[in-house]
Amino acid sequence: MDCKYCSNAYIAKCPVEEVPLMHLFPEKVVTIAKKSGCQSIVFAINEPTVSLPSFLKLAATAKKEGILVGCLTNGYLTNTSLQKLCEACDFLNISLKALTDEEYADLTGITSISPICNSITYASSVCHLEITTPVLEPISSEKLGKICRFIAQINPEIPWHVLRLLPEYMLKDAPPPDIQKIEQILHDLRKMLPYTYFGNYVGAQGLSTLCPVCGNIVIERINTGTCGGRLIGYNLSNGKCPHCNTKIPITGNYVDWEHLENGS
């Protein structure tokens, strides 16, 4: 897979001799994580299936120490690799860039979307799954609507991250996506996928989790200037919206990092 717009091309396409590699055994990575107070280890840039055996060893070592494991993946896997990856992970984020063979072939070079759709369907049934869709110009309401319906048919509670992509690599001269147009499209699509998020721009307002019934902010996040977000408010009461008592499908437990960082 060779994404035309890869925002990590400066790493992924960099000649090996120019990269200051650091060789770490799984035990060392886990030791570093524990000393840093980390509760999870995530492959967020590296595609885990490129070095799946190493990833599986790291995941097994981490789980022995009570550390959660997750990854971001393109989802282009064999059934065997998919099953092993899901067994090793507590959570997955799969990138769904389009929903036709033609678009995927144009954007990435692969000729069939079937393995990716299969990965999403299977992963949603065995572990916590979230999906990210990069958006670039020209923005298509039809394309986003099709992806939204596909996800909703599998499980309408799957979190969907719509990423305003700032193209690099072969499309580095492409214009940045229109924020207002994307927001207008997502306004209606949230009726199908209530846990839809939109970010990667300064002042992003679409990063918080809203109660699908009353619209109350139950988990508040702010934009950090990049594609990330910082959690600043956790308003759930026993996993439910404090306003209308609706159960919110959150996986895992809330950790108050601010108090941990202050030593309390």
Where are these regions (language model features)?
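Conserved Radical SAM active-site core
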Residues: 1-91, 259-264
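Conserved radical SAM core fold
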Residues: 12-13, 48-50, 76-82, 92-110, ...
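Short, solvent-exposed loop/turn segments at secondary-structure boundaries
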Residues: 17-19, 105-108, 142, 172-177
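Alpha-helical scaffolding segments of alpha/beta enzyme cores, especially the outer helices
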Residues: 28-31, 53-64, 80, 84-87, ...
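Conserved glycine-rich "GG(E/T)P / GGGxP" loop and the immediately following alpha-helix
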Residues: 33-61, 100-118, 127, 133-152
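Short, well-ordered coil/turn segments that N-cap beta-strands
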Residues: 37-39, 65-67, 88-90, 125-129, ...
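Hydrophobic faces of well-ordered beta-strands that scaffold small-molecule active sites
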Residues: 41, 69-71, 92-94, 129-131, ...
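Auxiliary Fe-S-binding modules of radical SAM enzymes
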Residues: 144-264
